[in-house]
Structures are given as structure tokens and as C-alpha cells.
Amino acid sequence: WWQALAAVLLFDPLAVLGVGTWLSFGLVAALIWACAGRLYEGKRQTAVRGQWAASVLSLVLLGYLFASLPLVSPLVNAVSIPWFSWVLTPLALLGSVVPFAPLQQAGAFLAEYTLRFLVWLADVSPEFAVAAAPLPLLVLAVCAALLLLLPRGLGLRPWAVLLLAGFVSYRPEAVPENEAAVTVWDAGQGLSVLVRTANRHLLFDTGTVAAAQTGIVPSLNAAGVRRLDKLVLSHHDSDHDGGFQAVGKIPNGGIYAGQPEFYEGARHCAEQRWQWDGVDFEFLRPSERKNIDDNGKSCVLRVVAGGAALLVTGDLDTKGEESLVGKYGGNLYSQVLVLGHHGSNTSSSGVFLNAVSPEYAVASSGYANAYKHPTEAVQNRVRAHGIKLLRTDLSGALQFGLGRGGVKAQRLRVYKFYWQKKPFE
């Protein structure tokens, strides 16, 4: 085990940063821990013990790495581990040294449809979301998993179960009353904003398919979001609603959209106000215009908590912004503005920036994106107004606290050591 790990790290030192390395070597270590040195055990007992070891440790690793636990994981492991070990891997190795086409084709066929089946099963199987636990609790959970794999006579398993229960049931600290926690996710060249109050959650847009599956949904699980009280889809564009199917697995209290005809059961984000836990929410709507494109139909959301405000405009263009200014005027004032259309030249006009007069402007854009968002013109315009520009492509996800004390901003990507900092930051 140690030699294999050393060989992998020798040829690819960065493999230690990969999830696959931790899962592969972690589960093999669990098998060795549970099965090595056991006397007077038959093959069936050894197989059951190995399955038990893989399931217990994967519970901790999957919960920490992906913030969710596939409930069918133990059953899938019980079937797939011997299938890969005794069928697919031998066929692949044999096909690499024996130039016999039917054998190679059979191996490729079985491997392809096995992976297709596993991907399908992952999509349809229920999952249990796990909040991101602090490091001390994670260490205790790993110790608990190892205790569960010790011989039964030691009497430590009940304590291990208690520790694992604490890991699985952990919930992050709640947002205080009359305050809001806002997270602008790093959704690549897309947009997704989570607004949390003491007891409620609203998600504005879902980003792209890839961003939702690999980042947003796991991040929602890690944040302890078990239900979305409102899901807002600003308009029908893949960088704003591409992750709808993935996020749609999370229960929600209603879907609101700028183009509700594209989503079953959705309602239009027309002008309406509501309050959650002392925090005011309002959908703003530009004046009616003719020949509006999809971007111009974007939902516009304003959130006010203790006098501090957030404004999100989706992909609203400059004409829509000017319409908002004419309709709402100084009531648009917000300390945090998520720039329209990822910082494109089609949004963030000088008139609009004057009306909103934000302290922070956030550009949700992908690193080195082909559109060069946020554009140089928008950056210059923002800085000319004395506004601090924050970018998800450089800083990752951004978090804002709204309350009576004003706005507190921080980035979620925290570097502890100087060598972890990227050159472009």
C-alpha cells in the first residue's frame, strides 16, 4: 500500500490534491485495517467484512468531499467491487497484452455499459445531504470509522456510532434574525446567488450544468441547505438555468422566473414583496418595453437586511437598467450590486451605477472567459464611481453579511500558505 502510494506521488505529486487518490487509497487502507491478520475466517466472512469496511469509511470520505451520501452506496459497492476486480480489470489487462480484437471489444463494451449504468444510478438514487463539518469533527469521524472496524469484543463500537451520528447530523451556525448571508458562488461563466436568513433560503439562478453538479449543489449541501424556500431563474439561458435539473432535486417552495413558460409550475417574478425573519425581499420590474430579448426579461431581486441591501439583475441590459432608474430612482440604492451580464458592456451603465451607488460590485464570470468579462470598459466605469470590484474568476465564491452593522465581505477561498496562492490573484 505504502509503496503504491509512493509510486503514484513520485510520478504525479499533485495527485494528493485529487479526490480519486483519497478515495482509492483510503478505502484500500480500510480494507487492510479490517481484514489483515484475521484468523479462522472464511472467504464469505472476509468479503462481508471488506464490504463493511468500505461502506463505513466511504461514509466519512463522501460526506466530507461531496457533502452528500448516496443511500445505495453500500449496495453498489457490494456488486461493483467484485465486478471490477474479477471481470473488468482482468479483461482490460488481458486485452492490453493479447492482440485479440473480440476480447478487447468485449472488455470495452462491458466497461462502457457498466459506467453508463453507474452514472444513471447516481442520477436517480436518493442522497442524504451532509453539512461541511469543522476539521476536529472530521478527525473524530475518521477515528469513529476506524473504531467500528475493530474487533467486536473491545466494546468501543457504541461510542463510534455516537461520533458518526454527530458528524452526519452537524449543522452550521444559523444566520441571526434581521440579517442575511449572501453567497455569490463561483459558477464559472454563469451566475448563482444564495440568500440565507435565520430560517429561509433563496437561490437566484443555478449556473451551468457543470457548475451546478460539481460546485453549487455540493456547496448547498455543505451549507446545510435542505430545502429552498424560493428558487429564482432569472431567464432562460444555460449560464443561468443550466443547473436547474441538478438543483431541482433539492425540495423547493416555489419556482419564480422571468420566462416561466419554460419551467413547469413556475410563476412570473412580477412585482411582489415579502419578508423572512426580519429581512425584506422585493422583485423589481422595469417598465414595459417592446421587442425585449431574453436578457431583458431577467428577474431583478433586491434584498434589504437592517438597512444593508443587495441588488441582483441577472442579464438585464442598459435599457432595462435605465427603466429601473426611471421607475424606482433612489430606492435602488444597495451596498452590494451583482453586475448584470457578468460585467458585459451591455449592462452596468453609468446612470445605473449612480442610482444604485454600491459599495461593492460583483462580477460573476469565468476565469479567462472568451468574452473577456468583466470588460475593461465596465471595470473602468466601476472604479471611476469609487466602487470596489470583486470577481469570482479571481477570488472564487464571495460571501456578504447584510445587517444593522452594514456589509461584511469575505471570500470563501482562503489561503493559509503563500505557496497556495495563484499567480493571478
Role assignments for model-derived ranges:
Residues 1, 16-27, 342:
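Membrane-interface micro-motifs in multi-pass membrane enzymes
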Residues 6, 10, 19, 29-183, ...:
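Transmembrane helix-bundle segments that form internal channels/tunnels in multi-pass membrane proteins
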Residues 16, 210-211, 236-242, 262-264, ...:
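Active-site environment of divalent metal-dependent phosphoester hydrolases
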Residues 200, 251-260, 357-360, 385-387:
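A short helix->loop->beta-strand "cap" motif at the edges of active sites that frequently abuts
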Residues 228-239, 337-341:
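Metallo-beta-lactamase
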Residues 232, 238-271:
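Active-site HxH/HxHxD metal-binding segment of metal-dependent hydrolases
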Residues 323-397:
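Cap/insert and terminal regions of metallo-dependent hydrolase folds
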